[in-house]
């Protein structure tokens, strides 16, 4: 049986307390090594950092890498990564790994640029927004997201449970709860509704994560982290932070 090791965080130095001063250093201890924080984490979308070998990535000082559940779900498939021994073995990376939930890609690639809109929204009209929504490839409801593959247009559905199942097969040390991506053009009312949805999804993720941890007891322990949402509104952001 594989040795089980929890992921833990140890605080190092902290700035002197003052309004707006919350900086600190620390160490994240994972089953596959430690990460000194703050840290730059390269993105290996499809289990590879494009143009770089694992040795070259390590030579940059990178301590961990992050891969994407959405893209690995579509190609080559989480079952293949699982059979290879998990995402670290699959990409020949000897160190800590992260996977994101796939939520960002499901919604951003499905809805198009309006879902990942930049800060400047001054040039948009209601007609622009309606036109973008007509052709979007993702639909969100309280249970999950229906979307079409960017590869072949096939239909798929992600729920919190599906995201956890995929990420457990990918086997990263740290994974993220499935959350809803919103935009700066969404109303405050929608942002607040979305925050509640993200909280409910996080609880469902935790329940499924606990179940899969028992089912896959021969695998290294994986740590589940939440995602703070609320866009540019301070109260929803604080609420998410305090309740996740």
Feature map (PLM): residue ranges:
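A short secondary-structure junction signal
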Residues: 187-188, 236-238
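Short glycine-rich loop/turn motifs
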Residues: 23-25, 223, 239
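Short beta-strand/loop segments at the ligand-binding rim of alpha/beta enzyme cores
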Residues: 219-225
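Structural beta-sheet core signal
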Residues: 99, 226-228
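Active-site glycine- and acidic-residue-rich loops that bind
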Residues: 229-237
């Amino acid at each position: 049986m594989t040795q089980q090791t929890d992921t833990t965080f140890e605080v190092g130095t902290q700035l002197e307390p003052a309004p707006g001063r919350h900086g600190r250093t620390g160490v994240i201890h994972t089953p596959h090594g430690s990460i000194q924080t703050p840290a730059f984490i390269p993105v290996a979308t499809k289990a590879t950092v494009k143009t770089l070998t694992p040795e070259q990535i390590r030579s940059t000082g990178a301590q961990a890498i992050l891969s994407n559940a959405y893209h690995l779900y579509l190609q080559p498939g989480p079952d293949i990564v699982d059979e290879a021994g998990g995402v670290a073995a699959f990409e020949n990376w000897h160190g800590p790994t992260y996977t994101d939930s796939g939520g960002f890609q499901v919604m951003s690639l499905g809805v198009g640029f309006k879902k990942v809109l930049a800060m400047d929204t001054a040039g948009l009209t209601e007609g622009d927004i309606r036109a973008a929504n007509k052709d979007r490839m993702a639909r969100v409801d309280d249970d999950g997201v229906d979307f079409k593959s960017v590869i072949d247009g096939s239909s798929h559905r992600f729920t919190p449970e599906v995201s956890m199942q995929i990420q457990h097969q990918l086997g990263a040390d740290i994974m993220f709860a499935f959350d809803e991506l919103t935009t700066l053009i969404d109303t405050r009312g929608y942002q607040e509704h979305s925050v509640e949805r993200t909280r409910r999804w996080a609880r469902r993720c935790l329940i499924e994560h606990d179940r899969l941890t028992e089912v896959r007891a021969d695998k290294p322990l994986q740590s589940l982290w939440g995602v703070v949402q609320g866009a540019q509104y301070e109260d929803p952001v604080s609420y998410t932070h305090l309740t996740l």
